[in-house]
Amino acid sequence: MKKLFLFLLISLFFSFSCKKDIIIVEAYYTNWFGGVKEVRGKDFMMVIDKETSKNLQIKHFLINDKKFNVEVEEKGNTIEIKSRISEGIDKEIELKNPIEKNSFGIEYYNTKTNKTKIFKLKKLQYKPRSNQQEKFS
């Protein structure tokens, strides 16, 4: 009986200590091309679970260690975090190159712990735009 109680106590401790601030539903980027010749960029999107993220204030996207402003929108049980980056305009990021591994994430403030944290993804998925055919020259 003591062993069972000890096991349950340890399991409970680990479940609280390993609780994540963010549960990602989806994270991806798409290419976009503007109406003006040679204007292009990327849209970045991260969808996170609303319930586990209720104490968070999303501050920035981190892309190749540079900070970019975000739009945050609640939709049902999720929170959408978006950013549109224009090549050559926004901090002169080189968007023709792929996003480096482990270099995409978000910076957020946790109101419960009063700490700013960074959450990084190992890989960011590319998703072609459905309403726009992409042409590469």
Please give the residue ranges for each predicted region.
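Bacterial Sec-dependent N-terminal signal peptides
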Residues: 1-23
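Non-catalytic macromolecular-recognition regions in eukaryotic signaling proteins
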Residues: 18-137
